[in-house]
Each structure stands twice: as structure tokens, then as C-alpha cells.
Amino acid sequence: RRSLRIWNIHGTYNEKPSSFTIQYGYEHYCGCIGKIDSYLKGTYTYWVQKQKKEIAGIPEKLRKPQLQLEESWIDLFFFSNVYIMGLNLSSEEIDLLYILNLRSRWLRDSKKARCIQNRIVFYGQPAKAMKALLEEFDVEVCSSSPTPPGKNAKGTDYEKYYRAVLRDIQYRIKQAH
């Protein structure tokens, strides 16, 4: 049986749940993009118990499936179907847009494109320009069903919406198998 994991991508998670923090401010996001870029290119390193760890870049992981270890949520944008909900993809989410942009460029590279077989689906009602950008990034936009709650929505409206989105995701997963 396949498992479904939900990742909160806007934060940092170390070994302890108490270390989870949300990033605020452009300087944090710019720093995050630098780390994401290093991760994507295979130049990202980190230390665990005084041992230096190196991670293969996405191009190498595309060529060698045995390296696809899902070491980060970033990997999912290249190797798993991804369903995005609850984000408006404003400028604060530039890190996510950076990954989507790079992925779309790699989809136009014949060597990399045949290895990227996943889908990315966005739930929400983005502005017209953002919707066009997402579609250019090869992201499927589900803006009408289910309909997101409006500006004056109550908490229960959001709960109903998220449950409807999760049902839609479950349906899509069943259809794919």
C-alpha cells in the first residue's frame, strides 16, 4: 500500500519536532533559494554527528534512480506527484516558484525530460497572471473544483475545502493506478 505524506514546505525541520520554525522575511527566503539551488545542483553538504554528508544533485538523481532517496521535499517536485494547496504563491513563496521554474526548463531538455514523469497540481484561484505562469511551468491548475473559500470565510469553510481537496487528490491517485 502506498502512503500519502503531507509536507509543510515553508519551514525548517531538524531531528526534533520542537525545532520546526517558519521562515519570515525576504532575507530568509533568499538564503533558502541559495540552499535549494545548491541542493538541486548537488553542491549542498551538511553535517551529522561530525560526518560530512553530500547529496547528489537532481540531474544525477534523474540519471540514476537508485539515488532517488527523497532526502528532501525538493526531490518530490521531480520524482513524485505533488499536490499544492493552501498557498497563494505570492512573492514570499519565491523558493517554490524557483523550483517550478527550474523543473519546467528541465522538462524542455530532452535528456532530462524523459526522466521527469510526475505531475504537479495546484489547488486554488490564482490571479490570471499567476495561473498563466503556473501553466507555463507545467503545473495543472484546479481553480474551480473544489472552490476555495472566499475572503470572509470561517474556519469550518476552510476545513470543508481542504477535505474536498483531499478527496479530489485521493480520486486522482486512484485513477492513476
Residue spans for each PLM region:
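Short, flexible loop segments at the rims of nucleotide/cofactor-binding pockets, characterized by
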Residues: 57-64
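Extended, H/D-rich, highly charged conserved domains that either
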Residues: 1-49, 65, 69-83, 87
